[in-house]
Amino acid sequence: MKIVRNVEQGSWDWMRLRAGKVCGSELKYLITDKLAVRGWKTDMPNSYLYRKLDEKWIGGPREAFAGNRQTDQGTLSEPVARKYFASLLDTDIETVGGIESDDGRCWVSPDGLVNSQTGLEIKCPNGEKFIGWLLNGPHVPPEHILQVQFGLYISGWPSWWFLAYCKSYPHLAVPVEHNPTIAATIKEALYGFNDRFDEAWKILCEKNGGPPEPPQKKEPTQERPLFSWDQGAVNESDDSSQGIIP
């Protein structure tokens, strides 16, 4: 794997680097909340495949996510939370652009690194959601299990921290280890995705008479889209009861 430094998360260069790659926050489009690989006869994985093909073709995202009330809160609170947890863990936390897999087909964007060997996933939810996490913890909330385990899968590191912060409340800090069962599911999902991606890319290039022209660098539009892939909800009735090995 390759740690990408000197690139700010959320910048256009960052968006370009992760374009066309499977990202940790997007794994839900390939794997259900019950931690099963989604069938390719359903719309969700196919729509995700088309989106990633489009990103690679044009060299970046089609549109930029401008944020919403929840993500704005998280963005504003994250630096405060990072300083808080640096003090709690008694260590320096390095911010990086992301981590790219060895084959260059996957990308994770940790919220920090500890000693370049442990990743951090920091969440700063509103009070209502945070209380639920505290009362049902200490463990990684089901909706964030895949993202954390994907970081472990791509990096190959033995541990990752899930850290949740909400001002005036006690913190939630969960050390996470590699889960081989989830890793096997991720591997299966990526194999199916990459196989279909390669076949579709070959067809697109044949129809085009060759690969696309190299993209020109440009700034994305700042209008908020009607739907964001990273922030859009996946509506499924049952939450996964499968936990994380602490």
Describe each model-derived feature in a short phrase.
Residues 71-93:
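Acidic-basic catalytic patches of nuclease active cores, encompassing PD-(D/E)XK
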Residues 1, 80-83, 159-163:
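Intrinsically disordered, low-complexity boundary segments flanking structured domains
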Residues 185, 192-224:
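Polyanionic, low-complexity intrinsically disordered segments
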Residues 13-16, 29, 37, 109, ...:
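Polar/charged alpha-helical tracts
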